[in-house]
Amino acid sequence: MDNKLIFHDSDTLICFLEIDEIEFLKKLFTNIIIPEAVLMELNVNNAPVNVRDNLNDLISDNFVEVREVEFASGEYIKNKCICEGYWTNGRPIGRGESAVLAFAIENEGIVASNNLSDVFEICEEYGIPILTASLMLAFAYELKIYTKSEINAIWCRILQETYQILPKQTFDEYYTELFEKDCNVLLKNYDFKKHYTVSKK
């Protein structure tokens, strides 16, 4: 199986950057790709200091790769159409989400985002898998990178220490009630566990 490229939106990264869970990201991924628009969103002046510092440290370590939407490229045209609402009945989409979607469509990749209200419709249309923070946490448990109690603790910290929203109050509830459905509906049954195994070789 050839691994798909995963393009990360700001909201999934904030879940872990804001609570200083850098090691979680490093254990689950070999690298992270973000568009320049996502970098700008995460580096704004009102962003939490540790979000900016953690992100910039990961960029300095070459763990996070920043990609620019090149003028007149396939990504550029798609990004412009999505951002200005041409593909969503006139409803504009944020710059970060638009760029992530454009890269994922052009490269037949994966969108890592919690912002389903913005990305789900277009991902459905183009058959693009979606990887949420909830799915990341569940796979970290399934792959035995973390124990269930450790994942529950991270889940709780995200809800208590960030403004990010998770679909259930506890990881146990999510894993029991929604994980299988999300693998089917959002991730489109993409084998992330095999993706992890291949990427970590």
Region locations from a protein language model:
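Feature 3881 marks metal-assisted phosphotransfer/nuclease machinery
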Residues: 1-5, 16-31, 40-54, 60-61, ...
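Structural motif
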Residues: 5-6, 110
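Short beta-strand scaffold positions
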Residues: 8, 113-114
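Metabolite-binding pocket within alpha/beta catalytic cores that recognizes anionic/polar moieties
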Residues: 8-14
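Anionic group-transfer/hydrolysis microenvironments
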Residues: 11, 37, 116
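Acidic catalytic patch
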Residues: 63-89
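Acidic, metal-associated active-site segment
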Residues: 94-109
